[in-house]
Each structure stands twice: as structure tokens, then as C-alpha cells.
């Protein structure tokens, strides 16, 4: 049996993510993991994971201070995989509005992160998702697989249009809490989830395995 080298994943450490739980989850599925904000390490890794917890504006400030916006942009321009989790997904959209304060995001995708349209907020706990049939991220997972969410804000409208037939349209996965919201996106080298795969048990482990399999 030919042994393949473990994939190297950098968990980007900019002060606003559950970096240790992400590290443990990735290591459990066979990745070689480093927690760092070092530019060269983040650029050279097979995969870059950007976790995020807290307020949208604060996460963006932390990411900019760590030059994470540049790292993400440079990796994506070279087709190098990047994955965002929770607020690490939200900051990939155009902007976020929290408590009436608007902050700019990275604008990889059009859309506004706003308060969840639900009676019970935050959305905390396990929920199912509706993934496209051709999803790579959710490959091998049943439709009733459950993932762990904890958030008060989300993207309720996916507005990106792909008119170029040579460019594959992003694959968008939805979940519902009150109104439907974006639960995950697969867009070329850039994937992201609103839920926490590192806290989602076997389903989350399968999902991370699927991501690592693309690196």
C-alpha cells in the first residue's frame, strides 16, 4: 500500500476563532495541522482554515491586522483551498450588520450578514441542511445528517449570478431557523460553513475529510 503524505492545513490564528478545537478535529481526520498567522506558512499549506467567533466587525479588524485578507486573496488567486467556519464564513460576504452597525467584509460573495429572522435567537444546537445533489463537501452524508450551529446572524439571500457558462456556479447549501439561511458554500477553491464541523461529531468529521480530500 502506497502511503500518501498527510495534508498540511494551517488554522489561521488571528484572535477570533476556536483554533484548538479546529486543530483537534483536523488532526483526528489525518491532517498535519499548524496554528499560526505566519504569512509563508499560511501561503504554503495545502489548505487554509479560517475559523471565526464573535462580532463580524471585530473579526474583520482582527483579520486585517493579521493580513489575513491578503493571505486569503493571494491563495484564492492561485487556486489554493481556503475554508471559512462560522464568522469565518460570514466575513467572506460583502458586509455585516450587527446592532445597526455596518462593517465591510471581504466581498468574495455578494450578500449581507444580518440578524436571524427567527423568534428564538441565537440558533444554538443541531440542525439538518439541504445540500445540492452534486455537493463535494457533503458527499457521503445522509440528508438527515445534523450539524452543530451557534449563531445570531446569517445570510438569508444568495444574490450571486453566474452568467459565464465556463465558470461553475457556486454550490449553496441551506438550513432553516425561522427563515432559510445560507449554511454552506462551495465556490472553486473557497468553501465555507455557517455551522461548526469541528463540533458536529461524525458528520463533521466526514465533512472535514471531504475537504481534505480535495487538497
Protein language model regions, located:
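Structural signature of beta-strand start/N-cap positions in the alpha/beta core
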Residues: 32, 47, 81-83, 146
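Short, surface-exposed beta-strand/loop micro-motifs that present aromatic residues
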Residues: 174, 179-186
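Pocket-forming structural segment of enzyme catalytic cores
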Residues: 94-177
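N-terminal beta1-alpha1 ligand-phosphate binding loop
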Residues: 9-30, 198
Amino acid at each position: 500500500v502506497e502511503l500518501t503524505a498527510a495534508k498540511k492545513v494551517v488554522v489561521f490564528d488571528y484572535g477570533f476563532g476556536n483554533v484548538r478545537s479546529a486543530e483537534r478535529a483536523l488532526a483526528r481526520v489525518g491532517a498535519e495541522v499548524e496554528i499560526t498567522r505566519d504569512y509563508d506558512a499560511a501561503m504554503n499549506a495545502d489548505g487554509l482554515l479560517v475559523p471565526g467567533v464573535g462580532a463580524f466587525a471585530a473579526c474583520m479588524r482582527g483579520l486585517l491586522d493579521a493580513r489575513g485578507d491578503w493571505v486569503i486573496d493571494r491563495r484564492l488567486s492561485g487556486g489554493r483551498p481556503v475554508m471559512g467556519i462560522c464568522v469565518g464564513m460570514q466575513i467572506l460576504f460583502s458586509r455585516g450588520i450587527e446592532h445597526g452597525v455596518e462593517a465591510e467584509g471581504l466581498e468574495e460573495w455578494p450578500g449581507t450578514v444580518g440578524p436571524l429572522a427567527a423568534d428564538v435567537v441565537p440558533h444554538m444546537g443541531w440542525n439538518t441542511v439541504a445540500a445540492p445533489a452534486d455537493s463535494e463537501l457533503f458527499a457521503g452524508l445522509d440528508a438527515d445528517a445534523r450539524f452543530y450551529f451557534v449563531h445570531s446572524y446569517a445570510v438569508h439571500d444568495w444574490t450571486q449570478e453566474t452568467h459565464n457558462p465556463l465558470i461553475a456556479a457556486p454550490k449553496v447549501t441551506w438550513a432553516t431557523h425561522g427563515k432559510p439561511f445560507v449554511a454552506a458554500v462551495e465556490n472553486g477553491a473557497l468553501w465555507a460553513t455557517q455551522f461548526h464541523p469541528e463540533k458536529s461529531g461524525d458528520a463533521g468529521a466526514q465533512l472535514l475529510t471531504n475537504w481534505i480530500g480535495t487538497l
